């Protein structure tokens, strides 16, 4: 049998079992665990290559063949690091395995026919589209920024640059909810909106659910009292939706123990659980030890660096409508920004005690940096803490799976949309991001939305080939017209679907109901389910998990930073 070198094989078909790939300029390496290819029978498109009539391309009609095949991609997902072909059909993932022509090849999972388009995945990393579950919908331009970074689902609240939206992730009331659902039809992004949950009686919350909310948000700026928490969670239990909470920084209506007691063991998603983004000062971080709490971070504190504390004070004053001339406002800001808890947050992510990472877009968060901040945190922890026990000096597969789960499958599970998005698995929406390894985490090479290319770096449109400068991210055909509407989802609750919200507001995009949100616990958070016994010293702000003091140094330099964004 003819053989080629491992290096030559990787150049031609991408890495195979035992090969390692560096993620961007981080110190993280992943190793291929499985390759679905049959050596010598790989499919590849191009002049003189395999996917041609009667060779790798069969005669099968499109009823049997896939619409699109991504060839020889290296998949990085919470479930594995595998090399495979990915078949797409009707905007969803049809199969992951071996593609080709079953008339002349054995063990074919994905049939290539005359109706099949090809995307070359050789040498590329494929990940699921990211999910940002903490969005202030302040301006529509956020959506393009997020899409170009590798995010394909945005969940949160707001109604434009109103003062309330600038501070809180709530789309309040049926009128605003309806208008935001109508606006959602215009964007190549899966969207879901959270109603305002701050009320002590149920009627005003129920009408938001029937108007199309996919969940509710409790925010301290609207008064997150034990009574409003209890009422909001009662509605969530009734309508099977998730509640997100920004707790009481000032401890006006109670302390962290009172808030945890108000949960009454019911599931809740705690936003920026470290507290710099808001929450009981100084000890909201203790919530990550509770079984019913699904803790997330927002990206300005990811990871802890020499600049983190300084920039937060200015952000806080602007976002929460504070006045630097009022001493009480300054004291409020100072109470929220603590280097000790921010440093501990790094380690809690590495331990799997914090389960999700999101942005907090334009409200103390950067919407285009969820992905890169996640991998910067993973890198910092690898450098400072070494390989995880489940990994070796050779590769960081477990750590990579843990961190990618924080912005893909775990927010999907938390908000009841994992049946649609959050991972690369058959049956799910084909929201797929392709990365060149050298640019992993910073700049995607292709953004596939609902099976159609929605965005990509693209050169001069008047050039003779696609690559001449200036190359920058541009919307593609999947971002336009009816095609865009049919390759995205708007998430609502089942009651809104039953109430005819699609017809009521004349919505064009498919709607999908969230489900199974009330049975989720911390143990449902994939690879991020640790519930440590948490202690916080109220004077020194020292944080301990299971008795261990959590301390790390701020980073002075990070990967996936300046060298990637000069242009």
From Swiss-Prot:
Carboxylation allows a single lysine to coordinate two nickel ions. It comes from Hahella chejuensis (strain KCTC 2396). The gene is ureC. Signal peptide: none annotated. Residues 129-567 form the Urease domain. This is Urease subunit alpha. Pathway: Nitrogen metabolism; urea degradation; CO(2) and NH(3) from urea (urease route): step 1/1. It catalyses: urea + 2 H2O + H(+) = hydrogencarbonate + 2 NH4(+). The active site is at residue 320. One of its GO terms (biological process) is urea catabolic process. GO terms for molecular function: nickel cation binding; urease activity.
